Amino acid sequence: MVLTQNVDTFSGMISANHKSKVSSDEDDDDHGSRSVRTQSLPFSVDALMSTKERSESTSQGSIHMTRIINQDDRSIYSDSVDFIKRRESAKEDSAWINKPRLSTSPRSQSPTICPLRKHKTNRKPRTPFTTAQLLALERKFRQKQYLSIAERAEFSSSLSLTETQVKIWFQNRRAKAKRLQEAELERFKMASKPILHPGLTLPFPLCTQPQTAALVCGQSFPFSRHMLPFAPIGIYSTPMGYSMCHLSKDGYSVEPV
């Protein structure tokens, strides 16, 4: 009876241990399957958090690498710019040293063209007249400034020239004569102007008669004597002034110096 109870008790203990072991195995299996399930689910909270942490660490690492690369690029760029500047300054210094102090500009072989004068490319050269031809042309021009067609043909054949050459020479000679005439007329106008400068005025009028001078301007002077008569200024070749004339002994006439 007692043995039967002990056997039952032992079997119950074995079954209890077996059940607890089975339950623990089942718990372990459930935990493993849960962890597997948790790892296998990509949209779970843990997966999202772990992904975010990994992305943040990756982005920080990339930013750090980018900064390092940018710093390297800047240092390389600054070094290259400094090198270029030093090379340019060295070139300028060498050019200044090698350049002579007094550099003579190369002379141009061709004559310079005046910009104010129109140069014709197809202009014919001037005809080299001989001395005999020039004397004959001048003598003919003094006789007659305009030649007819027949006279020009005859005259050109006598000088062994073409009619065109004679015609052009007469045209140029008439233009020269006109210029000389205008210059002579201008010189004559300058010579015919009054000698006394318009800005130079005398303190008293020029009167030819003492009575007229006394009547016109005798009261404007504190002296009681009459105005002195003056001869016309046109007869004097130099401007008239106080130092150019003196009074005579009688005090009424003026004599040029």
Swiss-Prot record:
Region of interest called Disordered, as start-end residue ranges on this chain: 18-62, 100-124
One GO-annotated biological process of the protein: embryonic morphogenesis
The keyword Zinc is assigned to this record: no
GO CC terms, sorted: nucleus
InterPro entries in alphabetical order: HD, HD_metazoa, Homeobox_CS, Homeodomain-like_sf, Msh_Homeobox_Regulators
Segments crossing the lipid bilayer: none
Record localization: Nucleus
Biased composition (Polar residues): 101-112
Entry superkingdom: Eukaryota
Molecular-function GO term, any one: RNA polymerase II transcription regulatory region sequence-specific DNA binding
Key words, A-Z: Developmental protein, DNA-binding, Homeobox, Nucleus
DNA-binding region: 122-181
Primary role: Probable morphogenetic role.
Family statement drawn from the similarity comment of this UniProt entry: Belongs to the Msh homeobox family.
Protein known as: Homeobox protein MSH-A
Species the sequence originates in: Danio rerio (Zebrafish)
Gene: msxa
